[in-house]
Curated annotation (Swiss-Prot):
The keyword Repeat does not apply. Disulfide bonds join 47-84, 56-77, 63-81. The peptide interacts with the surface of DPC micelles by two alpha-helical regions. This is Antimicrobial peptide aurelin.
């Protein structure tokens, strides 16, 4: 009897994980359909925000002063603030 309860519990957990995975897949598909242009537009909008611009400038100055790791950090600056 105890083994049956464990089996039922395992089946319930498996079903719940499948439902969560299906929901994530739907969200991912919606983002793909939204397209890269929408992502670029939203990033530009974030960059136009004054606070974000300040973060970009601070990050860029940090990258310039970073010494040996500067090349890698500057690449991150371009990724983070390239559209600012």
């Amino acid at each position: 009897m105890g083994c049956f309860k464990v089996l039922v519990l395992f089946a319930a957990i498996l079903c719940m994980s499948l439902l969560v995975c299906a929901e994530d897949e739907v969200n991912l598909q919606a983002q793909i359909e939204e397209g890269p242009m929408e992502a670029i537009r939203s990033r530009r909008a974030a960059c136009s925000d004054r606070a974000h611009g300040h973060i970009c400038e601070s990050f860029k100055s940090f990258c310039k002063d970073s010494g040996r790791n500067g090349v890698k950090l500057r690449a991150n600056c371009k990724k983070t603030c390239g559209l600012c």
